[in-house]
């Protein structure tokens, strides 16, 4: 029996994939506008992509902005993510700053979930997972390959590693060059979900070619999908409203 992940009334790992919409404002005014606009969307979860935020180097400013976002989102689940440039993010910070930023966010109690990148020092990842869980914050451990789609075995291996490190939600996003690459991601998702996962997983194939993977999570085993509000944070994201409509059609017929 797989465990479910429950965040503020949203349950990941049962029913249709839950829709997450990123907030990508560069400053507090833009973020507040996006958070207010989010309330008009038919989405389940918000993700603050703090790597877009111009004051991300100032932890106090980050925590203050987080408090503003939390207030506007009310009871919506909120993921805090600093995506490194190496994995498709807007900027790079040192490893030490990356971990201290995430730890500071965890200790505010304002984010429900943090996203930690898999390819970091294992002991530091484990320590941050432990700190997060101690503050009742769930953890995504993620990997993003914007260059290619690895072999199915490698995709499964990375997801299993994230699970072993304590992720509540192991995640991988890969870039397809061919249609066969998309099939490989779906095959790996199915294999992980049926053979190895004891918790919900999140997978996607990016760009236009991979769009089917954002829609078919309930069939193949991905518990969350990402939709766009006004500006996409990754290639291939479609509008949240359209996404929910398609997911409901699929859910009714499965």
Swiss-Prot record:
SUPFAM superfamilies: Aldolase (SSF51569). CDD domains: DHQase_I. 3-dehydroquinate binds at residues 47-49, 83, 214, 233, 237. The keyword Amino-acid biosynthesis applies. Its EC number is 4.2.1.10. GO terms for molecular function: 3-dehydroquinate dehydratase activity. It catalyses: 3-dehydroquinate = 3-dehydroshikimate + H2O. Pfam families: DHquinase_I (PF01487). Involved in the third step of the chorismate pathway, which leads to the biosynthesis of aromatic amino acids. Catalyzes the cis-dehydration of 3-dehydroquinate (DHQ) and introduces the first double bond of the aromatic ring to yield 3-dehydroshikimate. This is 3-dehydroquinate dehydratase.
